Amino acid sequence: MIALIQRVSRASVVVDNQTLGSIDKGLLVLLGVEREDNREKMEKLATKVMSYRVFSDENGKMNLNLEQVGGSLLVVSQFTLAADTGRGLRPSFSGAGTPDQALTLYEEFVAFCRDKGVTTETGQFGADMQVSLVNDGPVTFNLQV
């Protein structure tokens, strides 16, 4: 399971000209599911995302996590993160999770974060989305479990 996280001052996702999710300070999470992923991996990754210290403390050091800064999550499904780009000029998605598996784990990821008290907004699974963000830093990390 893969989470590409970006520290943002604001982010939103639009589908069919309607804003589905919007946050101010927090993390934009592009979430990719691979074939071997399961609930255990999802919980480990969600915990890591929520606990990852990517926000600056009073000394300017990345030392604070999402909860410590009162931040939110915007979680957007992104199967292209599971692409194999090692050969040729066209990505292979053979390692990506099935649509049913990915939808289940995406929904469980969102529910897990909400159950932990984190304000969590979403896009629409499988939709053509327009994602807007102001990347604070920029700060971007690729987390995998």
Curated annotation (Swiss-Prot):
- Would you name any one GO CC term? cytoplasm
**Gene assigned in the entry:** dtd
Q: What does the sequence similarity comment in the record state about its family?
A: Belongs to the DTD family.
- Name it: D-aminoacyl-tRNA deacylase
One Pfam short name = Tyr_Deacylase
- Which Gene3D superfamilies does the record match to this protein? D-tyrosyl-tRNA(Tyr) deacylase (3.50.80.10)
Q: What's in the domain note?
A: A Gly-cisPro motif from one monomer fits into the active site of the other monomer to allow specific chiral rejection of L-amino acids.
Top-level EC class: hydrolase
Q: Which organism is it from?
A: Shewanella sp. (strain W3-18-1)
What are the GO MF terms of this UniProt record?
D-tyrosyl-tRNA(Tyr) deacylase activity; Gly-tRNA(Ala) deacylase activity; Ser(Gly)-tRNA(Ala) hydrolase activity; tRNA binding
InterPro entries, A to Z: Daa-tRNA_deacyls_DTD (IPR003732), DTD-like_sf (IPR023509)
Q: How does it assemble?
A: Homodimer.
Cite the EC number.
3.1.1.96
